[in-house]
């Protein structure tokens, strides 16, 4: 939030007894039966959605990654407890709650928004699809009560935050690593640029790819966790030895919010049969415990913890332990080395590196022309990601800071610049 005096204040959100400056774009819907027998449903967003989901014994419907579907015309919405909800309507619910929280904290109406957007939305294969995604996002914000909605590229917003620390002009490369996208911008920033006013030619170029932290997490699940749950296990079927469990079940494990879709009678029968026939039944039993306990969120918290620890040291141990009433408890302890993790994400790293290559070539800029590389977002902590940039630009030119909030701060500064307040 841009304050009247020009300062920036971040909204805080309650989560498990703490106040945090970030809000995940998730929704959780639960249903219950009234005394009269009627079915009622209620929805929650952000940290409260995660809290309600974790506390619920009978899990409702958890929805996330909505922005990743904005460019897809075929995906108009989803059905929740028998009612059809448009995609824009679901995003409006999140944005409305954000706006309400901001008004409560800052004590004044919030009617203008500068919204961050990726360079290229996930799944967008043309400018038309990209603009379609923007139009849907704009509709959601307007329906949430905002009277004026402007958009800024997320890496450009991060550049605004970095620029506030400068005492001279620089040509900078911004790398913004989110959950679903990695975005890059090349632009000139600094005090003189602010004084003379920004020009279109100050932004030399943008590129983006639809992968980042979530893709890295999925690799850890596929290569480390799923084998411990039987993905490579075999089973006897008549005179044949076949995979114990269909591969598509493990694909659902790679995205924690998909795991709840496995809690069906069909999957239960598949897993029950697999456990009986499997050569490693204990692994299938562990998989059953995770599916029946709907432990996808907890599992991925352990995955992210292991990824974080591998950013700090060469080796760690992936640990996951949970006990579910009426179901066998599960405990996984798997050693993992950074070198293994880096081998799993080799193709992803190559895609990111290629995106930076394209940006430099299309902008006519050589690596030695770049004064500074500013990396933001949680995935920027991954050593293999940072090496892509230190190898090309030198460690002395790599900088980070406020990795989880720099885009939000930059959006406020972008709004101020657009309004002529600076």
Where are these regions (language model features)?
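N-terminal phosphate-binding loop and flanking beta/alpha elements of the actin-like ATPase fold
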Residues: 1-19, 49-174, 188-210, 215, ...
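Short beta-strand scaffold segments in enzyme catalytic cores
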Residues: 1-3, 25-28, 183-187
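Phosphate-binding loop and its immediate beta->loop->alpha context
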Residues: 6-138, 142, 224-308, 312
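Short glycine/serine/threonine-rich phosphate/pyrophosphate-binding segments
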Residues: 180-185, 408
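Helical "lid/coupling" subdomains associated with nucleotide-phosphate turnover
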Residues: 194, 218-234, 254-422
């Amino acid at each position: 939030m841009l304050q009247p005096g020009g300062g920036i204040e971040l909204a805080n959100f309650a989560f498990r007894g703490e106040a945090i400056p970030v809000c995940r774009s998730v929704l959780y819907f639960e249903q219950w039966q009234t005394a009269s027998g009627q079915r009622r449903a209620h929805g929650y967003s952000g940290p409260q959605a995660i809290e309600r989901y974790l506390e619920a014994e009978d899990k409702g419907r958890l929805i996330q990654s909505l922005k990743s579907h904005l460019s897809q015309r075929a995906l108009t919405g989803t059905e929740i407890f028998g009612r059809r909800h448009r995609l824009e309507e679901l995003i409006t619910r999140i944005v409305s709650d954000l706006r309400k929280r901001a008004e409560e904290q800052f004590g004044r109406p919030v009617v203008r928004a500068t919204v961050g957007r990726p360079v290229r939305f996930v799944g967008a294969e043309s400018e038309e699809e990209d603009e379609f995604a923007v139009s849907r996002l704009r509709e959601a914000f307007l329906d949430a009560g905002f009277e004026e909605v402007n958009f800024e590229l997320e890496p450009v917003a991060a550049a605004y935050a970095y620029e506030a620390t400068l005492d001279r002009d620089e040509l900078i490369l911004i790398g913004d690593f989110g959950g679903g996208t990695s975005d890059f911008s090349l632009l000139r920033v600094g005090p003189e640029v602010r004084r003379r006013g920004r020009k279109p030619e100050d932004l030399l170029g943008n590129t983006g790819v639809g992968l980042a932290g979530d893709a890295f997490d999925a690799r850890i699940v596929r290569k480390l966790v799923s084998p411990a749950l039987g993905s490579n296990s075999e089973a006897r079927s008549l005179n044949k030895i076949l995979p114990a469990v269909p591969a598509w079940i493990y694909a659902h494990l790679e995205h924690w919010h998909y795991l709840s879709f496995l809690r069906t009678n069909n999957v239960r029968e598949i897993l029950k049969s697999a456990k009986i026939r499997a050569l490693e039944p204990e692994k299938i039993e562990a998989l059953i415990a995770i599916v029946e306990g709907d432990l996808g969120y907890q599992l991925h918290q352990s995955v992210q913890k292991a990824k974080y620890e591998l950013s700090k040291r060469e080796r760690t141990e992936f640990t996951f332990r949970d006990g579910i009433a009426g179901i066998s408890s599960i405990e996984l302890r798997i050693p993992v080395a950074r070198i293994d993790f880096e081998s799993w994400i080799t193709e992803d790293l190559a895609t990111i590196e290629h995106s930076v290559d394209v940006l430099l070539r299309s902008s006519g800029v050589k690596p030695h022309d770049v004064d500074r590389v500013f990396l933001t977002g949680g995935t920027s902590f991954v050593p293999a990601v940072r090496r892509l940039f230190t190898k090309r630009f030198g460690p002395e030119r790599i900088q980070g800071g406020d990795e989880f909030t720099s885009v939000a701060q930059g959006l406020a500064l972008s709004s101020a610049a657009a309004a002529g307040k600076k």
